[in-house]
């Protein structure tokens, strides 16, 4: 089993830890908890770069190794990094539990060294009709991020 972790922090007070596990060539399981977010839905994505030299802005676009349009996690046509939305409760916390086949921890399309980004607004899953729907899901600004690293 391969394990990875990212610790998310932001100047806006968002904190949390997200864990990734993958058994063999199976899907990757994503679990964790975040706090300090406004209640509601927030876009949750793997971005292409593990670069935070300019905060979350330098993490690049959504991880998209095969050049597809933005979509929902269950769509065939989606960026690999499109993990949909997380739901934040009235207390500002979110529990994450995602199983996804397009974010492996090994191989040529591994997400190790890339970034997880939490956005300020809901991801419209490519269906919002906004000019940004097919590229970012119109999910708004980047409120927290962290680099995905291997875990022992």
Swiss-Prot record:
Give the cofactor note text: Binds 1 copper ion per subunit.
> What EC number(s) would the UniProt record show?
1.15.1.1
Cofactor dependence:
Cu cation; Zn(2+)
According to its UniProt record, where is this protein located? Cytoplasm; Endoplasmic reticulum
Claim: Oxidoreductase is one of the keywords in the record: yes
Gene3D superfamilies referenced in this protein's UniProt entry, alphabetically: Superoxide dismutase, copper/zinc binding domain
Annotated tissue distribution? Expressed in fruits, leaves and pollen grains.
Keyword entries, A-Z:
Allergen, Antioxidant, Copper, Cytoplasm, Disulfide bond, Endoplasmic reticulum, Glycoprotein, Metal-binding, Oxidoreductase, Zinc
Cystine bridges: 56-145
Binding site residues for Zn(2+): 62, 70, 79, 82
Q: Give the glycosylated residues.
A: 9, 33, 85
Cellular component terms (Gene Ontology): endoplasmic reticulum
| Catalyses which reaction(s) | 2 superoxide + 2 H(+) = H2O2 + O2
State what inhibits or activates this protein.
Inhibited by KCN and H(2)O(2).
Q: What does this protein do?
A: Destroys radicals which are normally produced within the cells and which are toxic to biological systems. Probably involved in the protection against oxidative stress during pollen development.
The entry's family comment says: Belongs to the Cu-Zn superoxide dismutase family.
What protein is this chain from? Superoxide dismutase [Cu-Zn] 2
């Amino acid at each position: 089993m391969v394990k990875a972790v990212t610790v998310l922090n932001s100047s806006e007070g968002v904190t949390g830890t997200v864990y990734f596990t993958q058994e063999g060539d199976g899907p990757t399981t994503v679990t964790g908890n975040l706090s300090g977010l406004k209640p509601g839905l927030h876009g949750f994505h793997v971005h292409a770069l593990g670069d935070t030299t300019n905060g979350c802005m330098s993490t690049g676009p959504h991880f998209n190794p095969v050049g597809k349009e933005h979509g929902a996690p269950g769509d065939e046509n989606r960026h690999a990094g499109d993990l949909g939305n997380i739901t934040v409760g009235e207390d500002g916390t979110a529990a994450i539990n995602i199983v996804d086949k397009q974010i492996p921890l090994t191989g040529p399309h591994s997400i190790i060294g890339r970034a997880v980004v939490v956005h300020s607004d809901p991801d419209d899953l490519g269906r919002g009709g906004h000019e940004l729907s097919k590229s970012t899901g119109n999910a708004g600004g980047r409120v927290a991020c962290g680099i995905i690293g291997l875990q022992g």
